Amino acid sequence: SITRTNDRSHDVIRSGMGRSPLFAGAIEGRGPRYCPSIEDKVHRFGDREGHQIFLEPEGLDTHLVYPNGISTSLPTDVQIDLVQSIDGLERAEIVQPGYAVEYEYADPRRLEPTLQHREVAGLFFAGQINGTTGYEEAAAQGLAAGLNAAAVALNLEGARFDRGTSYIGVMVDDLTLQGISEPYRMLTARSEYRLYLRADNAISRLGPLALELGVLDLDQAQRVSTHLEEKGVAASMLAEGVTGRELGISDTARRPLGEWARREDLLATVRARLPAGPANDEAIDDAIYAPYLSRLRDELAARSRDRALAIPSAFDFGAVPGLSNEMRERLVVAGPADLDQASRIPGITPAALSALHFTLARAAA
């Protein structure tokens, strides 16, 4: 179910704002940008009539409900008034009041790409201690650190995740090279290769690494090897030239089968020419995405050539389409003189650089 805060809720929050650790100065650290507390939402977006709340059951055999959207560190008495001011929750009882946690972190720039500390052999860091926020972020670091800790214990070569083949690689690279200035969240915009980092091609991207590291049992290893072999065969079939007439249309041109797959009216016909299975579906998706990946490579090459493209001192970063508030803030604070300097701002994303490059190049044309 979904409900919303209202004017009564906001009045309750404002009346207790001075007792919130976040606003009274008891907590000085910056909270997660993408998970603001309800008092922060009301403070920053005072003109909003309400904020959405998802009422999430805690399980099938419990009456407990988690109100997702009103995380808070307000005193318990204020929280009770807040919850009971919300439509549908007038008689709700709070079992566990909300709270805020301020935690320390270790500078992740002191870690190797394996997440081992540069100065203390055998000591690995993963999760919030590295300044990240989020379950998936912590789990991914735990996987990377665990693999490498095991490798050290067994005197084996460690695992290094590449940013071109995994979001784990993007995150570890960002953390260990750039460090953080606020809690780090993994976003697709942080990857310059995000069009390639699809859910359906995870086996092809990371399967070879898993085989190399020996972390799969015999059955898993066989399934990965079979998948890679089947995809290779499918890719070869999609590279073969086929005329439109062979696919049931009047076009006599001969093109690779994969190119015909980009036509929506022929996609089912192309799929029917390949054996059914996830490896073959993945190969077809690769063929469909190929022009976009080629364009992406061209954009990255152009941005590399235009590193010296000047940014005027009075440049309005707010006028760049597609820039998030976070990216605008980072650019305004840093005040880069050119695109190269902008690319070296900690936390700046490839997506932001692409948007900035496009705007600057168009203005210079």
Indicate residue ranges for each PLM-predicted region.
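Glycine-rich loop(s) and the adjacent beta-strand/alpha-helix scaffold that form part
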Residues: 86, 91, 144-152, 342
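Internal hydrophobic alpha-helix adjacent to the cofactor/substrate pocket in enzyme cavities
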Residues: 138-161
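Charge-dense, low-complexity polyampholytic segments
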Residues: 155-168, 357-365
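Extended, charge-enriched "interface" segments that sit outside catalytic cores
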Residues: 190, 198, 202, 207-364
